[in-house]
């Protein structure tokens, strides 16, 4: 008898990802962060990578270029990020930087949401979290070899 899809690791990963996204949205709304979870992700990435081209940012935050552009438009309107045009390999690219205001916003939001995430994290053994992370990385590597995924 064939295994039902809802009993597979792939379904469990997708379901967990949806739970994480919903949890993130609820936490950001509950603590009145003033930005979305996706916008915070952008600020967090940029806070740790001072200058990044928009295309590389899109890959890291797992969004297409159009959605990344919309997120950046929203953040730029509030002076959390700035974009400048540059040339890379003879092609125009947009370089994104977090502003001081954006860095402050990311820090403020982290202070608001951190207790909630720590509460969830405390319920899971750290070695189990590391093990699951390693297994997921291994699974992605196998799928990358098998499917030639281009993200």
Q: Which residues does each predicted region cover?
A:
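Alpha-helical linker/hinge and terminal dimerization helices associated
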Residues: 16, 20-23, 27, 61, ...
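Basic amphipathic alpha-helical segments that dock to polyanions
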Residues: 43, 57, 72-78
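Charged, amphipathic alpha-helical coiled-coil/dimerization segments
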Residues: 73-134
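N-terminal helix-turn-helix DNA-binding core of bacterial DNA-binding proteins
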Residues: 22-66
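C-terminal regulatory/oligomerization modules of transcriptional regulators
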Residues: 1-4, 126-151
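N-terminal leader segment of winged-helix/HTH proteins
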Residues: 1-31, 80
